[in-house]
Amino acid sequence: MKKPLKIILIILAVLVGLVAALLIWLTATQLNVKTETAVVTNGENSTASFAPGDSVSILTWNVGYAGLGEESDFFMDGGKQVRAPSKAIVEKNMDGIVSTVKELDADFTFLQEIEADPSTRSYGIEEAERMRTETGLDTAHARNYKCAFVPYPIPPIGKVSSGIMTLSTAPIASAEPVQVAGIGGQPQALPDAGVYRPRGHGRSARARQPPPGGV
């Protein structure tokens, strides 16, 4: 075998090995939707109570990880940007999201695509934690998308840890995520379902978040 050909084959073998190692690593670190649990936190502002037959107000909102505002030109919508132009813009968007949630003051708020942990596309901003602390409401949060590194496009999306959050003006006693079938019968990546019971005595109440794209 000629030396140039041998070098080319070695380089190709190394590249194939690196790609295989990357795929194995991504598979090993991806979110296991069957074992994901919802995290419940309690806030001082969740003091409401509901009786059977009461009407409740609901806000459902895909916040787009606070990175898809008017300044963004997202590549999956035909644009050129992978993430918002700057961390300051994501902070501004989060300010607006928190302000709107507080202003509308719904009994139950269902948020989709809110970062559970620091992610590359949102410049490491802890969005779920901001929502908890700044609203002071009881919350239930579960991840539905986690990847240590999304290798596309160029530049790559990078680390993502995103989820679905429910905020309640009434105290949350418990919550659980429920996996449902998605489009074409494929499993969804853990649409969140919050299960709530009033503290103390009384009939149980349930607030379930719809799957992404649902109503």
Task: Please place each PLM-identified region on the residue numbering.
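Intrinsic low-complexity, intrinsically disordered segments enriched in polar/basic residues
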Residues: 2-3, 199, 213
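N-terminal, active-site-proximal structural segment of metallo-dependent hydrolase catalytic domains
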Residues: 3-133, 137, 141-152, 156-161, ...
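A broad, low-specificity signal marking well-ordered, structured residues that form hydrophobic/aromatic
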Residues: 56, 165, 201
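Structural signal for conserved beta-strand scaffold positions within catalytic alpha/beta enzyme cores
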Residues: 60, 141, 174-179, 214
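Catalytic domains that recognize anionic headgroups
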Residues: 108, 214-215
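Conserved beta strand-loop-helix elements of the APE1-like EEP
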Residues: 133-136, 159-175, 204-206
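Active-site catalytic loop in hydrolytic enzyme cores
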Residues: 170-209
